Amino acid sequence: MQTSRRTFNAALASLAVGSALAACSGSRSKGKKLTLGFISSWTDGVCMTHLTKIQVEKNGYTTELKDLSEPSVLYTGLSKGDIDLYASAWPEVTHKQYMDQYGESIEDLGSYYGSAKLTWAVPSYSAMNSIADIPGHADELDHKIIGIEDGAGITQISKEKVQPAYGLDDGTWEVKTSSTQAMVTELEKAIDAQKEIVVTLWHPFWAYNKYDVRDLEDPLNA
């Protein structure tokens, strides 16, 4: 799957945001308020939001954190100026559909991580090395790929690109959606039981540090 950038996205109407991230003087920013949007189930985005909050408040801004349920709601808020900044955007791949829709009203303020990547991953003990190996383990996997939220970009890409590319769209396979935390819980249970499991993951994400997992090869670059 494709590599992307993790960036800061801002509402064009919020001229204060660019100054905040450029560390302008407190005297210029004192009293101004920034609304930072995030999705609480996406822990990497939560971390970036709080780090951004600390930095902009050092420069005299006040902040409001707004927890939104889905990326579509977040990007709608950005486009309307209800949200000033989203600190964990994936503009080229994961959130491309929203940038295509709202891009004229949203400004990309720059990248903080240049090698973000969407993957399907397995525990290190897995007999699978490639996505192409998955059909041979259908019974062990119960014909399921364990995913995250239904509205997530990786879910859409998994269903619309990866499944068709590898013949997993015949009606017997499912990308199971629920939440990021539910996916991590299923991963942990499978590892504890030494069972096969395939989950949708991405870099950077803390699960790679906590669990002994590895990415499946994607020879078709789906």
Task: Cite the ranges covered by each PLM segment.
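Ligand-binding pocket segment of bilobal, Venus flytrap-like solute-binding proteins
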Residues: 83-87, 157-221
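Short helix-initiation/N-cap motifs at beta->coil->alpha
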Residues: 42, 65-76, 174-186
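Ligand-binding cleft/hinge of the Venus flytrap
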Residues: 52-59, 138-175
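N-terminal segment of the mature folded domain
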Residues: 71-121
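A conserved helix-loop-strand patch within extracytoplasmic ligand-binding domains
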Residues: 104-151
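Short, well-ordered beta-strand elements
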Residues: 31-43, 63-66, 142-146
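C-terminal motif of bacterial Sec signal peptides marking the signal peptidase cleavage site
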Residues: 22-23
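N-terminal secretory signal peptides and thylakoid transit peptides that target proteins
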Residues: 1-16
